[in-house]
């Protein structure tokens, strides 16, 4: 027997698939019906198979902490996140706007430094950062684009609103896994 959606509760968390116990969101009904047809054992086997493929393909990421480089397998939930098209269109536009703002920030840091002069960000926070690259001062990349790609980690709050947990501009490795 599959998942009993009538008894399922996401507690205080927003659920992208289920709006209330037993009620799938319109755009997730097909997936919910399919998942409901699988037993817990079948779901577990599918997750294990995905984990094995990821490990065998060497899909991993490195956690850099305290001088250690720890390789970890890339986590993949076999249940996809389904996001309504209209909602995703809004999020995508916001992410594009965010990347433009990040590029403007980096360009300012390495050129005019208006953000420092205006007292918005303390000089020492930027200038003493181990990630601040003094040789980049004065560089003006084409169109002011320092980062062509950004890995923004999205989460939802309890009301279902998207929030950016962090932006990864250095090495947004997750994107390359999607290309694989």
Residue ranges, per PLM feature:
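Preference for protein termini
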Residues: 1-180
